[in-house]
Design a protein with these regions (language model features):
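PLP-dependent aminotransferase class I/II
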Residues: 1-117
Length: 117
């Protein structure tokens, strides 16, 4: 049986290999790259509509870190100025399910739903 990190890497690879929709950008995985995959984050310019579509199709999504770090109350005093790319990305990010019990076959099925979006 795969350990949790191996399982998440396998699921992440399934997502990355099967998501093929220009409206939803998945991370690019290089070679045998491995990480812990605490989250599998994609980008969708129309995030709210995408999340609604996923929900209607039975796939839960989440938004982690919706507020960019420079806009967090504890950092306001630092006056970072405008960070338009950071703010745009914060408005686009969506986390897909990756933790157990999600399997590679589940990820491929979810990718199919994403590809029909």
């Amino acid at each position: 049986m795969l350990n949790e990190n191996d399982s998440r890497n396998t699921v992440a690879r399934a997502y990355a290999d099967h998501i093929d929709n220009p409206r939803v950008k998945a991370p690019v995985l290089f070679g045998n790259m491995k990480q812990t995959w605490h989250q599998f984050v994609v980008r969708a310019e129309d995030r709210d509509a995408f999340r609604s579509y996923m929900e209607v199709n039975g796939v839960g999504t989440d938004i982690h870190y919706a507020t960019p770090a420079h806009k967090q109350p504890c950092y306001r005093h630092m006056r970072h100025g405008e960070l338009p790319v950071t703010e745009r990305l914060a408005d686009e990010v969506v986390s897909l399910p990756i933790a157990h019990p999600i399997t590679p076959d589940d990820a491929i099925a979810i990718a199919g739903i994403i590809n029909r979006y």
